[in-house]
Curated annotation (Swiss-Prot):
Native source species: Cryptococcus neoformans var. neoformans serotype D (strain JEC21 / ATCC MYA-565) (Filobasidiella neoformans)
Function: PPIases accelerate the folding of proteins. It catalyzes the cis-trans isomerization of proline imidic peptide bonds in oligopeptides.
Name of the featured protein: Peptidyl-prolyl cis-trans isomerase-like 3
Catalyzed reactions per annotation: [protein]-peptidylproline (omega=180) = [protein]-peptidylproline (omega=0)
Example of a GO MF term: peptidyl-prolyl cis-trans isomerase activity
Upper lineage: Eukaryota, Fungi, Dikarya, Basidiomycota, Agaricomycotina
EC class (word): isomerase
Gene Ontology CC: catalytic step 2 spliceosome
UniProt EC number: 5.2.1.8
Key word Isomerase present: yes
BP GO terms, sorted: protein folding
Family according to the record: Belongs to the cyclophilin-type PPIase family. PPIL3 subfamily.
Length: 167
């Protein structure tokens, strides 16, 4: 199961961990498939740490889950921030996941157990490199827009299962 984030700097393909974190994957996939992420900005960019997006307001304060309220963390000991390109839900504390997500630029072991990891970058590291090199203001907001144009969902087992198809 994978998606491709089409950005103005290039594409990033992400493998999703649907079996390990089904609720988080369902939320992300549904937001992708419904176009909720289309045209949104990556509003926070910290070199050596991560880039954050998924807020339709572009402020870092907006966004909502598909259930209309925050949902619980899915922390798994087998999923760790042990590589560049790990993808996780951004939150404001335990069990406050909505629509915002981030992609790491490096190993971040201090984040383990605090954020629901739901995927990893499997193609497009050069795009991630370009994002990381984008200059930012003192509040870590990119000086040049980094925009998520749209998302391609390559296979959606959750939707297929709901339609009675093969999972």
């Amino acid at each position: 199961m994978s998606v491709t984030l089409h950005t103005n700097l290039g594409d990033i393909k992400i493998e999703l961990f649907c079996e390990s974190v089904p609720r988080t994957a369902e939320n992300f996939l549904a937001l992708c498939a419904s176009g909720q992420y289309d045209g949104t900005l990556f509003h926070r960019n910290i070199r050596g740490f991560m880039i954050q997006g998924g807020d339709p307001t572009g402020t870092g304060k907006g966004g909502q889950s598909i259930w209309g309220r925050p949902f619980s963390d899915e922390i798994r000991q087998t999923l760790r921030f042990n590589n560049r390109g790990m993808v996780a839900m951004a939150n404001a504390g335990p069990d406050t996941n909505k629509s915002q997500f981030f992609i790491t630029y490096a190993k971040q072991p201090s984040l383990d157990g605090k954020y629901s990891i739901f995927g990893k970058v499997i193609d497009g590291m050069e795009t991630l490199d370009s994002m990381e090199k984008t200059p930012v203001n003192p509040k870590s907001r990119p000086l040049q827009e980094i925009k998520l144009l749209n998302v391609t969902v390559h296979a959606n087992p959750i939707a297929d299962q709901a339609k009675g198809g093969l999972a």
